[in-house]
Amino acid sequence: MKILIWHVHGSWTTAFVQGRHEYLLPVTPGRDGDGLGRARTWDWPASAREVTPAQLREEEQPDVVVLQRRRDLELCREWLGREPGRDLPAVFLEHNAPGLEPGDGPVPHTRHPIADRDDIPIAHVTHFNELFYDNGRAPTTVIEHGIVDPGERWTGELARAAVVTNEPVRRGRTVGADLLPGLAAAAPLDVFGMGLTGLHEQYGLDPARVTLFDDPPQHAMHAELARRRLYVHPVRWTSLGLSLLEAMHLGMPVVALATTEVVEAVPAEAGVVSTRPERLWAAVREFLHDEDAARLAGKAARAAALERYGLNRFLRDWDALLEEVTR
């Protein structure tokens, strides 16, 4: 089938477009939020095609739309002249934990933006999110993440910790940016992601202790992550980070805050999960000094990630949902 989906979350979409369908990715002249088109830093197959609004109106009518934002509803009406859920089958893919968008309201009373509709199912990416949103009348399901397996590549040759985070200066405490000084005191630290400019200054980080890798291509980031001794996930409040699951696939041991879905994703043998930063920093130091323990934890992390977050299961789950809504 032809699936209309906007390029909103590159890592998630990388897994989604590995399926057997045609994926129509809107592109606008400015490649803005209404139409980013194909990814520049991820490898997507030819079945993921860029389409203009005019093409969508005239020749590329989709069979189903995967909505990810309120704005997508408006664009379907404007570009296609069709109403999602009524004359265009639709699923609303909710990437976020509640309370992160303007107007969301306080958790756990955050009402989902389509909570008053019963004609569009909400697909949450974690059971935590499904539980904490007020979904109202909307039917819900959970399709957990799937990862394109980068392979078991961990060497741990560099006695350093790795963190992947996007826009930590803007997002601050939400992604645990304020915890980085404590982490950097426990281990030399490499931070990968987008929007890292100003991170040293904002949190008083020593450039000799903390190195930034701003927006590397995914394949290059995986290669660099695998050389670090361990992966640290200091995030307070987001959905389950795909970078965490990718690190587990690489075979990296994990040290993570026990928040949102992390406690379900990271088994005890894969590393250390706690709400106590001092316990996490102690675990970081232990892995730096015990490479064998890091290797064993990394193997357990990879096994757990493959079992629960494999690509084939993810694609099967999405096929089943899309077939249901297009019946």
Describe these PLM feature segments.
Residues R71-V169:
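Catalytic core of nucleotide-activated saccharide and alditol-phosphate transferases
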Residues F132-G136, V148-L205:
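Conserved catalytic-core segment of nucleotide-activated headgroup transferases in glycan assembly
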Residues G198-H219:
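Nucleotide-activated donor-binding/catalytic signature segment of Leloir-type glycosyltransferases, i.e.
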Residues H222, L245-H249, T260-E264:
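Short alpha-helical segment that forms part of, or immediately flanks, the ligand-binding pocket
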Residues R236:
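Aromatic "clamp/platform" in nucleotide-sugar-dependent glycosyltransferases that forms part
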Residues P253-A256:
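Short hydrophobic beta-strand element within catalytic cores of glycosyltransferases
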Residues A268-E278, E286-D292:
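Conserved acidic donor-binding segment of nucleotide-sugar-dependent glycosyltransferases
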Residues H289-E323, R327:
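A charged, aromatic-enriched C-terminal amphipathic alpha-helix characteristic of glycosyltransferases
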